[in-house]
Amino acid sequence: MAWRDPFLFETADGELRAVWSAKVSPTRPAIAQARLKRAGDRIELLELGPPMELPDAELMTQAEVPKIYFDPKTGDYLMLVSACDRQHEGQPDSEVTQIHRLYRSRSPSGPWKAYGGSVSRLPGLDGLFGASLVQHDLSAGRLIVIGPYTENAGPERHLRFSEPREILIGTRADSERAGAA
């Protein structure tokens, strides 16, 4: 099974880590993780960690382009993933649901929980896949997100990046819009 989409980040205490897309079975996604160290102009592997399973993994077949950010105001880590329900590579894009999911944890290794209790789906990002957080403030319930448009966004947007989008999270209205999925 493919490992792809590596993302490097520093923890709150300055440790270098990596996460990437992985799977624990053909239809169950996970996020792989590793602790790294800088060695001159190289990066070396310190430890390959266990796969991080997502609390709602049964809602998707792939968790791609994982990115982890630290929120210094709350002390929480945020993990943003692009999720889809693709069953096989030959499946037409029109049959595949692509969404962004957000999780939070006190540790960069998890355990992870949906940002909204039972809700991980981020609203307001239709047509995007592989987005990044430009800014985040969990205490204010505010994210600024940018990402590439997919083919489903239409020919005028495909292969372009969105303008930054403000996403308000943590409110009851937001949770109701996002739905339990």
What are these regions (language model features)?
Residues M1-A181:
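Carbohydrate-active catalytic/glycan-binding domains of CAZyme proteins
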